[in-house]
Amino acid sequence: MEKRGLRVGLSVWAVAIVAFLWLPIAIMAVYAFNSSNVQSWPIPGFTTHWFSAAWHDSDVRAALWLSIKAASVATALALVLGSLAAFGLARSRFFGRDAISFLLVLPIALPGIITGMALNSFFAFWTIDLSFWTIVVGHATFCVVVVYNNVLARLRRTSSSLIEASMDLGADGWQTFRFVTWPILSTALVAGGLLAFALSFDEVIVTTFTAGAQTTLPIFILDNLRQGQQLPIVNVVAFVIILLTIIPVWVSQRLTTADDSPAVGRAAAVTAQTE
C-alpha cells in the first residue's frame, strides 16, 4: 500500500513538473493561432492567418534562411572538429589530455554573454568584420562540445578489440571503418549533429555579439517583441522555432537509445568479404 502511494505521489510530482515546464510554451503556441492581434486570454478564436502573414514577411523569410544556413554550417563544422577531437582523446594517451578535454567542454558551461563578448573582442582585435561567418564561428564554439561529448561517450563504451578483431580477420582500414567504426558511431554523430543544429538555430545571446547588422529568427523575436503590431507574427516565429528545436532533439534522443550491438556482427561479416 505504501509503495502504491509512493508511486502515485511521484507520478503527481512528475506531471506537475512537466506542466510547469511546458504550460507556458503551450500557451504561447496557442497564441500563434489567435484570431485577434491583441494578446488576451482566452483567445476569441483560432486562425492560421498569421502564419501566412509571417511567411509573406520578407524580414521573417530572410531571418529564417540565415538561421538555417548558420545552423547547418556550424553543425557541419562541429561534426568534423568534434569527431576528430573525440577520436584523438579517446584513442590516445598523452600529457595534458585531461586538460584539453576540459577546455573543449568549457565553452558550453560559460555564460553565453561571456562567450559573445569574448568573440566580439577577438574579432575587433583582428579587425574582422561581423558577418555570416562570425555567426558560424560563434555557434561552432558550443556546437563542437555537443558532438564531442556524443562521440566520446560512444567510443568509451566501445571496445577497441572490435577494430583489432576486424584487422586480424583481414579487413583493411576502409573496410574496418565502413563495417565496424561507422555503424557504431553513426547514431552518435547524427544525434550530436541534430542537437548541435537545435542549439545553433535558437541561439540568441552569442549571435547578438557576432551577427552585426544581420538578423536571425531569435534576434527577430527580440527586436520585435515590444512592437504590438508585430506580436502575432512574433508568436508564429516563436512557434516555428519551438518545432524546429523539438524535432531534432526528439530524434536525437531516439537515436541515442538505439541498440548498436549489430556492429559486432558486421565485424565478422568483413571476413567473408575479404577472403
Give the residues covered by each predicted segment.
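Interhelical loop and adjacent transmembrane-helix boundary motif
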Residues: 2-6, 36, 51-59, 201, ...
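Membrane-interfacial helix termini and adjacent extracytoplasmic/periplasmic loops
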Residues: 39, 43, 48, 97, ...
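C-terminal transmembrane helix and the adjacent membrane-cytosol boundary/short C-terminal tail
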Residues: 3-12, 152-163, 167, 173-182, ...
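Hydrophobic alpha-helical transmembrane segments of multipass integral membrane proteins
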Residues: 61, 65, 69-81, 85, ...
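Transmembrane alpha-helices
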Residues: 12-13, 18-25, 116, 148-151, ...
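N-terminal, non-cleaved signal-anchor transmembrane helix
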Residues: 1-58, 62-65, 69, 249, ...
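Transmembrane-helix boundary motif in ABC transporter permease subunits
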Residues: 1-7, 72-104, 117, 121, ...
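A structural signal for multi-pass alpha-helical bundles of membrane permease subunits
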Residues: 23-36, 66, 116-127, 150, ...
